Amino acid sequence: MLSVNEALSYDKDAIGIGRKGTIDKPYILKAPFWTVDTLFYAIPREKVDLNFAFDIFQNIDWKKKDESTGVPSLSKTAINNIYVLAPKFEEQQVLGRFFSRIDNLITLHQRKQKQKSPPITASLVIYGSICFDCFMSVSNTS
């Protein structure tokens, strides 16, 4: 793929999933969106809620669908051979909104935690080094 001049979708959001490498990390593509040759995308059909479908994508063990010998890789055939049962559209919408809100809440709390927390790993390394140096000097004198 040398260049992309037009969006793949101007008005419908989709679910993106890596074709190579990060095959187990689906995410929502907001319209308009463009893609690259190492990404599959799925625009939900009528009567399929995007957030509900996204929840399904997140719960599929994509690594079991891996068709590679090196870098994790998916094919359209592997994706198209997945069948799931789904409730009525109205129920999908309720469930999709519910899980979307939970995902947003988790993300918000993770961001807050990162802002509040001092870099613990850096202080552990420093204290570990100090204690280790003291321990070594004690053991050398015995």
Residue ranges and their predicted role:
Residues 1-142:
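Feature detects amphipathic, helix-rich regulatory segments
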